[in-house]
C-alpha cells in the first residue's frame, strides 16, 4: 500500500491538509493475487492456449506515440529476421489500450501498430504459430497479472516515461520465479529495478542486443521498495 504523509494547517478558520501519496505498486497484493485460484486458472489457460512451451514475451502500455510500441515491433521483426531458429519458439503478447477516439494522432498510432502487427504475422506466421498477439482492449487487472506471471520476458520500451508501473508489476508477479525485463533507460523504473536489461528505443543496435540477451538472461528481479 502507498506510504502516506500529510501536513495540515489552519487557514482562515479552515483546516487545509496536503497529502503526499507516492506512485508505486503493492508487491504483496500482486503476489497474493497471482497465487489465487482464479489467476492460477488464467495462467493455466495462457500456458495451454498461447505459450505452448514457447518463450512468451509480454509488453503492456497504451496506444501512444511516446510508448515505443512501433519501435518494439520493428525490433521484434528484426529478431525474427536474424534468428530463424526462433520461429515457432517465441510469441509476443502486445497489450496496448486504445486511447479515446477523436484524436487523430492516437488513431494514426493505433493504425500503424495494427498494420505492423499484420505485416509481421503475414510475413512470418505459420498455420501452427502466430508471432504476435495484439489487443487494444482494456484487460482486467487479474488477467494482466496472469499474463505477467506466465511471461518469460517483459519488454517495455517507451521513448520517454515516468516511473512506469508495468515494469514493477511484472517484477512483483514473477517474484520467486525469475524472469527477464527489457526496459527503456528513459523510464524512472530503470533506476529502481535490479537485474533489468536496459535499452535505448532510439537505437536499433541497443534494442537488438537487449532482446537477443533476454532469453538467456534469466535473473531474479528486484524492485527497490523505497519507491513503492
PLM feature spans:
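Catalytic binding pocket for nucleotide-activated donors in carbohydrate/polymer assembly enzymes
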Residues: 81, 85-93, 149, 153, ...
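Carbohydrate-associated surface elements
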Residues: 24
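Conserved donor-binding/catalytic core segment of Leloir-type glycosyltransferases
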Residues: 50-66, 73, 93
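Active-site helix-initiating loop/hinge in glycosyltransferases
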Residues: 67-69, 75, 164
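Single conserved hydrophobic/aromatic residue that forms the stacking wall/gate
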Residues: 1-8, 12, 220-228
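Short acidic alpha-helix that forms the nucleotide-activated donor recognition element
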Residues: 140-151
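Nucleotide-activated donor-binding/catalytic signature segment of Leloir-type glycosyltransferases, i.e.
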Residues: 96-142
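Nucleotide-sugar donor-binding and catalytic loop/hinge architecture
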Residues: 10-14, 32-57, 84-87
Amino acid at each position: 500500500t502507498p506510504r502516506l504523509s500529510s501536513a495540515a494547517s489552519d487557514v482562515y478558520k479552515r483546516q487545509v491538509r496536503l497529502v503526499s501519496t507516492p506512485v508505486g505498486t503493492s508487491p504483496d497484493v500482486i503476489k497474493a493475487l497471482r497465487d489465487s485460484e482464479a489467476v492460477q486458472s488464467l495462467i493455466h489457460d495462457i500456458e495451454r492456449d498461447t505459450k505452448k512451451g514457447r518463450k512468451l514475451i509480454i509488453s503492456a502500455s497504451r496506444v501512444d506515440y511516446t510508448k515505443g510500441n512501433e519501435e518494439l515491433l520493428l525490433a521484434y521483426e528484426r529478431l525474427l529476421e536474424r534468428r530463424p531458429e526462433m520461429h515457432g519458439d517465441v510469441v509476443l503478447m502486445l497489450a496496448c489500450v486504445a486511447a479515446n477516439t477523436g484524436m487523430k494522432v492516437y488513431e494514426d498510432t493505433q493504425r500503424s501498430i495494427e498494420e505492423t502487427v499484420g505485416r509481421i504475422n503475414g510475413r512470418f506466421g505459420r498455420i501452427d504459430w502466430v508471432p504476435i498477439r495484439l489487443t487494444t482492449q482494456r484487460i482486467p487487472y487479474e488477467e494482466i497479472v496472469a499474463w505477467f506471471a506466465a511471461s518469460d520476458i517483459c519488454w517495455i520500451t517507451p521513448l520517454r516515461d515516468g516511473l512506469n508501473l508495468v515494469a514493477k508489476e511484472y517484477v512483483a508477479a514473477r517474484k520467486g520465479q525469475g524472469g527477464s525485463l527489457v526496459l527503456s533507460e528513459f523510464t524512472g523504473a530503470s533506476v529502481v529495478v535490479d537485474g533489468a536489461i536496459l535499452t535505448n528505443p532510439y537505437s536499433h543496435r541497443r534494442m537488438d542486443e537487449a532482446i537477443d540477451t533476454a532469453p538467456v538472461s534469466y535473473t531474479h528481479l528486484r524492485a527497490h521498495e523505497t519507491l513503492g
